Amino acid sequence: MNLFICHVFLLLLHGYLIICQDIPPDTIISAVNTAQQEVTQREASSFSQQQARASVAAFAGAPQPAAVLAASRPARTGLDRFNRRNDPQRNTELSIGGQVTQRATLALRSSDPASAAAPAARTLTPLDARAPAAGFSASSTMTFRNAAAQSCTDSRPVTVCDPQQRYRETDGQCNNLVFPSFPSGAFKLGAAFTAQGRFLFPAYDDGVSSPRIRSVIPGFLLPNARLVSRNVHSGTAFDSDRHTPFLTHFGQFIDHDIVSTPETEPKFTMPNSHCCLEPNLEECFNINFEPDPLLQGSCIRFNRADTAPSYFCNPGPRLQQNQRSSFVDGTMVYGWDVEQENRLREPGTGRLISEGDDQLKLEPVADPLNPPCFPVDNRCFEAGDHRSLETVPLTVMHIMFLRRHNLIVQELQNLPLPWTPELLFQEAKRIVVAELQHITYNEFLPRVLGPQFMTIFRLWPAPLFSDTYSPLVDPRTTSGFSVAAYRFGHSLVRNVHDQIGPGGLPVNNLLLQDHFDRLQTHLNVFPGGNTEGFARWMKLSQKSRADRTLVDGLQNNLFPCEDPDCPMGGGVTKSFDLAALNIQRGRDHGLPPYTAWRYWCTGRRAFVFTPNAVGLSDHSPFEANILSNTYRHVDDIDLFTGGMTEMRRPGALLGPTLSCIIGLQFSNYKRGDRFFYERPDPVMAFTPGQLQAIKETSLAKILCSTMRSFSNVQIBAMDRVSPSNPIVNCDELRSQDIIAKIPFLWNQLPNRAIQSAAARASNISGRTGLRVSTRFEDPAMLRLIGRRRLYKH
């Protein structure tokens, strides 16, 4: 019976026939137990785990001998801090669970030829608790789950969800109230510190976890990622004739809201080591090449992305962690969990903490074992996301929305209503998140995707209310989106960032490579109104054109290391190549080749490099020729490279494949978000007047409200000034802004708002309790899920 169910289910949903095998329960249990023993022994004896324990103890105040601290710290650079673990304990738990399920899956596949030979499905249905993984039958999957439950357990208490709660959970829990995880029963689909999803079944070389490095031509490997970068992604980076850097860096700002993938902590055998010195460790996946004078080395050290178990603790291929919630919910402003959010809040006021002229607050002196910034600084800005210091324009975005929150709090508290600090904070956050969502779907995405894909995926904002929410939509950020498609924004970055004075003349400029993650550079830039000088440049200048090329600051000088703690030996490079990292990260995640994504999105196969009906018809002859000179076979092309070389669609920045992936992902963010700002749900809905005011919000209005020296701005801040996009007076925009309308639109508060805020304030750390749900076993629910229709386009 199980075999029959598996045949029919996968044939209907995927167009593939996978023979699902019943494996003896004892075999499954033995494989899981062996995997648990191997992983536990490895973690307990590893150098990296000793470091993690020391780091947790240091945060808890336990004294650590100086010798232990010095010996425990591996060599770090800006890239390490960019990809760092935000919560070492939770990251380690997820990593252990992921390793156990993957090792056991690999062992079972190796022992069962039928399972190992099962063809990969085109698409996944991750919400279906019944869906067999890697060729396992439903009963075998359940046996596996129960055996691996201990490794998939989350040590955090389970949040008890209140369906009548008006305000979001900080970490994204309790958004989807239909699918509890296994074994905890927590409703954390799309929450921070869970696994990323997938649109397509991965293409790992061993079917489970080994990176994709083999060509489809037997006996050959894929071309070196640095070689692909130099062949395809180098060249003159032209400026855009239409868009401003605000489009670039708003997109980056949103990226840090929806995904943060930490790297593994390799099990080094010696202090101050790195992957170029110990390349054979399983966490290392270096990019090796002939000595390169631009990078000053021959090895780009590369740690694999940290792994996590699946949502239901199923057997199956390697998944990657996401430290952010998979919703457009302002995580980069407010933090990834309650503890981080509380660190950002000003006690007793509802405001976010700021320093000086409403600038970002500086963190306390960093933990020496996990420094967030360069060792010479050892501090960085305190923000909702640890990457706020990455570039100056990104820091400007953080400061803008910090100020926006505090301005809204100031207006709300002037109203004669029963405000509490918690109610002020939550209501202001609710407004800011709605504004972020509206700008994303009304200004940013139309410029990226163009009208065709905005319409296909129903992404246009409605005139007022619209309820597209479905609990059957999986909102999770997917690997293909996070490590390839959405990285198109790297081609939009300028190599030089300027500061423009009130008179419109440049007064300062910085090379991109000189302010990556550099606190002192930012401190030199921002005092005395310099925030507004860079914001002025962002609205008046041009972004780089969307194409296949990356500027020198990203391709040859990413995170240049000049500090005493720079890694040394093993041919390690002094800087990184972002295009090569993107390609290597896609292989690390096991992303299928570009042609598989193109077929999934468009239904068109490509058999040859030639840009004709049976080849790369979405590419120009010039781009197709570059690809044919780089790859041995059309099915070897990496998703990032293939997508970035497609011809752009009319009115868009991208070609059809990346537009499809990004469009579907943002459709899922919208349709899978129970708190989406357009919903008419009586518990959390805005009033018609409030929603109309939010829909009149624009990035230009937020600029005028948060940049006090601005006297004017163009109507659409993401577009350059033109006859169709004229400059308008900021006083006019301020009079139309939602802040000016708060006294009229928020002069009443529903009882549900007061009750929800009171519940949050009185039990901010006690809103937890053990509630293990078995709803995913309900046959009626399984039948409902089985009828779920996949989007076809």
Swiss-Prot record:
<dbReference type="GO" id="GO:0004601">
    <property type="term" value="F:peroxidase activity"/>
</dbReference>
<dbReference type="InterPro" id="IPR037120">
    <property type="entry name" value="Haem_peroxidase_sf_animal"/>
</dbReference>
<protein>
    <recommendedName>
        <fullName>Peroxidase-like protein</fullName>
    </recommendedName>
</protein>
<feature type="signal peptide">
    <location>
        <begin position="1"/>
        <end position="20"/>
    </location>
</feature>
<dbReference type="GO" id="GO:0006979">
    <property type="term" value="P:response to oxidative stress"/>
</dbReference>
<dbReference type="GO" id="GO:0005576">
    <property type="term" value="C:extracellular region"/>
</dbReference>
<keyword id="KW-0964">Secreted</keyword>
<keyword id="KW-0732">Signal</keyword>
<dbReference type="GO" id="GO:0020037">
    <property type="term" value="F:heme binding"/>
</dbReference>
<dbReference type="Pfam" id="PF03098">
    <property type="entry name" value="An_peroxidase"/>
</dbReference>
<comment type="similarity">
    <text>Belongs to the peroxidase family.</text>
</comment>
<dbReference type="InterPro" id="IPR019791">
    <property type="entry name" value="Haem_peroxidase_animal"/>
</dbReference>
<dbReference type="InterPro" id="IPR010255">
    <property type="entry name" value="Haem_peroxidase_sf"/>
</dbReference>
